[in-house]
């Protein structure tokens, strides 16, 4: 039986809005301690995504990366009633993908950033399946 891998795609590249503010719109607060991008990542985690892909160009990616980070805890395993719940927590990795430079001037839309995020997640999955597990194992020689 095949296991389903659910990838959450959050497109923030080429996001256009009606707000006239100098900061990116994804950093606007939606509640007391939560910004819009943090809420999107939390909703992907609550939906059961195994990976989260944020499509952000190079101008906004460092801001998003400093706000979100590289991973988020899976909310299902965060507060399990076990003796050592901190050891059973699972992390959901967050990947940052920029739009390809040849597509930035021609295919510069919100919909294209969604499609590019889907394609990047699919391509990474195909690449990891074709390489197999043996290519990622490193063996240390005795004495090191």
Task: Label the model's feature ranges.
Residues 1-84:
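N-terminal glycine-rich phosphate-binding loop and ensuing alpha1 helix
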Residues 65, 74, 83-144:
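Conserved beta-loop-beta/alpha segment of the NTase-like Rossmann-fold superfamily
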